[in-house]
Design a protein with these regions (language model features):
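Active-site-adjacent C-terminal substructures of enzyme catalytic domains
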Residues: 2-120
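Mid-to-C-terminal alpha-helical segments outside catalytic/metal-binding sites
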Residues: 105-188
């Protein structure tokens, strides 16, 4: 029986997976590699940093980063993207979840770059998951390019508006394949 702990958030879960046999693995989200619980209250309540499982203390984030960049095939990408409408996130009972899909790969690349482990990103993002599930590797390719861009504050479609992860931030990696397609970026 193969067991995957989806979207781990603690150093305890990292240790548990490391100590388990080869049939145990875990996914790690881009946002849990970038934020800790302080992001929820930075200058006030930040509903767009609220997700479940909730981001934990900084030492847990550090442990997740070390697991992700380790090259250990028991840890692999799991975005857990949650595109809740802005009005539902910014309400008195806001929805949990972070909309990371538009910049997930760029966010992972930023983390791996900061940790000096870009050579291990492909395994984490593209190989370890399929191999764990005994699935063929995808034939497609995505090229990440070191190129700065500013993530839009919101992504809108008609009356629907969603705030993406890294909204308003300038990132230093970009999926080259997306350069011509619509995504939440501002090149100004």
């Amino acid at each position: 029986l193969r067991i995957v702990l989806e979207h781990i958030t603690t150093s305890d879960s990292v240790d548990f997976v490391m100590e388990s046999d080869v049939n145990m693995a875990a996914t790690i989200t881009p946002h849990h590699l970038r934020i800790d619980r302080n992001a929820l209250f930075d200058g006030g309540m930040r509903p767009h940093a609220y997700c479940l499982p909730v981001a934990k203390r900084s030492h847990h984030r550090v442990a997740l980063r070390q697991a992700a960049i380790s090259g250990n095939p028991k840890f692999f990408l799991g975005t857990d993207s949650a595109p809740h409408p802005r009005k539902d996130k910014e309400s008195d009972c806001g929805c949990a979840g972070i909309f990371c899909a538009p910049v997930a790969l760029e966010s992972y690349a930023l983390t791996f770059d900061e940790e000096g482990a870009l050579d291990r990103l492909e395994g984490f993002a593209s190989e370890f998951g399929p191999r764990f599930y005994n699935l063929p590797l995808n034939d497609g390719r995505i090229t990440l390019k070191r190129e700065t861009f500013k993530v839009l504050e919101t992504v809108s479609d008609g009356d629907l508006s969603v705030v993406p992860f890294h909204a308003g931030e300038t990132l230093s990696w970009r999926a080259a394949d997306r350069l011509a397609s619509p995504m939440p970026v501002d090149n100004n």
